[in-house]
Amino acid sequence: MNNNEPDTLPDPAIGYIFQNDIVALKQAFSLPDIDYADISQREQLAAALKRWPLLAEFAQQK
């Protein structure tokens, strides 16, 4: 599983928070860790880097 994704779900009392469906399924069905890549997140990142060239420069320096 991607290291930057939380292993626990947020507290629903806090209000609307983005919920990772893979984490929810993993907890609901006691699934083992899987190597999952969020394709839509990658596409959004690529679009942001294309839209903002300065952001792309910072990403290359890292």
From Swiss-Prot:
Induction: Part of the yhjR-bcsQABZC operon, it is expressed about 5-fold higher than bcsQ (when the latter has a restored reading frame). Expressed in mid-log phase, expression increases dramatically as cells enter stationary phase, the increase is dependent on rpoS. Pfam families: CBP_BcsR. Disruption phenotype: Not required for cellulose synthesis in strain 1094. When disrupted in a cellulose-synthesizing strain (W3110 derivative with a functional bcsQ gene), cellulose is no longer made. GO terms for biological process: bacterial cellulose biosynthetic process. The keyword Membrane does not apply. Keywords: Cellulose biosynthesis. The keyword Cell inner membrane does not apply. Cellulose production is abolished in E.coli K12 / MG1655 and W3110 due to a premature stop codon in bcsQ. This is Protein YhjR.
